[in-house]
Amino acid sequence: MNTEEIASSCFQRTAAVLQVNSRTVRPMRDFFVERLGFELGTEIGSGPKFVTLDRDGQTIMLACHRTFGFRKHGWAAYFWVENIEALHDEFERRGAKLKSPITDKPYGCREIVAMAPDGREIVFGEITGTQAD
């Protein structure tokens, strides 16, 4: 038995990521807010290009494609976690294919991206509370 203590992480919540085939997520954002009763969370980019929407403790993300058509791959899900370093170490021990090391993002999260077998990205982020202007 290994007596070495291994740090562990804790999953807090998850969000589906809908890829919007448009230069803006505005119509979809308005649909979720005005017709389905979601509240606007984060909004990034002009148009906007990305939003989070919340209702009853559940979150959905809307993201624009970077080209006119659907991207072949992109975010499929986002998990908020505690202790991103421990999760990164666990994924490396398990042989997960990671897109990059832990990365500090301007929207106040530290993230790692695991690559699914079909090429989609499963993103894990820890909120740091430090958001760039």
Placement of each model-derived feature along the sequence:
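Vicinal oxygen chelate
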Residues: 1-11, 13-24, 41, 51-54, 67-133
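Core segments of cupin and vicinal oxygen chelate
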Residues: 19-59
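Active-site/binding-pocket entry motifs
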Residues: 59, 66-68, 130
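Short, charged/polar, Gly/Pro-enriched secondary-structure boundary elements
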Residues: 57-61, 119-122
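A short beta-turn/loop motif at secondary-structure boundaries
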Residues: 44-45, 68-69, 105-106
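N-terminal beta-strand motif that seeds the catalytic metal site of vicinal oxygen chelate
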Residues: 1-29, 57, 75-77, 126-133
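Short beta-turn/strand-loop junction motif enriched in small, turn-promoting residues
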Residues: 37-38, 65-67
